[in-house]
Amino acid sequence: VEWTDAERGAILSLWGKIDPDELGPALLARXXLVYXXTQRYFASFGDL
């Protein structure tokens, strides 16, 4: 994929607004609930 400078700027701007410490746990929980089979990849996390 080749990105234009405008596309790169838009992507960097969006990623700059994301707080991984806030969203990470919520996204992992959502992935484990919607795609229950993914829990096997996170067995070390305990019962999600």
Swiss-Prot record:
The keyword Magnesium does not apply. InterPro entries: Globin (IPR000971), Globin-like_sf (IPR009050), Globin/Proto (IPR012292). Keywords: Heme, Iron, Metal-binding, Oxygen transport, Transport. One of its GO terms (molecular function) is oxygen carrier activity. Red blood cells. Residues 2-48 form the Globin domain. Disulfide bonds: none annotated. Signal peptide: none annotated. Belongs to the globin family. Heterotetramer of two alpha chains and two beta chains. This fish has ten hemoglobins, 8 of which are anodal and 2 cathodal. The cathodal tetramers do not exhibit the Bohr effect, due to lack of the C-terminal His in the beta chains and to blocking of the alpha-amino group on the N-terminal residue of the alpha chains. The possession of both anodal and cathodal hemoglobins may be a physiological advantage for fish living in fast-moving water habitats. This fish possesses 6 types of hemoglobin chains, including a major alpha chain, a minor alpha chain, two major beta chains, and two minor beta chains. Involved in oxygen transport from gills to the various peripheral tissues. This is Hemoglobin subunit beta-B. It comes from Catostomus clarkii. The lineage of its organism: Eukaryota, Metazoa, Chordata, Craniata, Vertebrata.
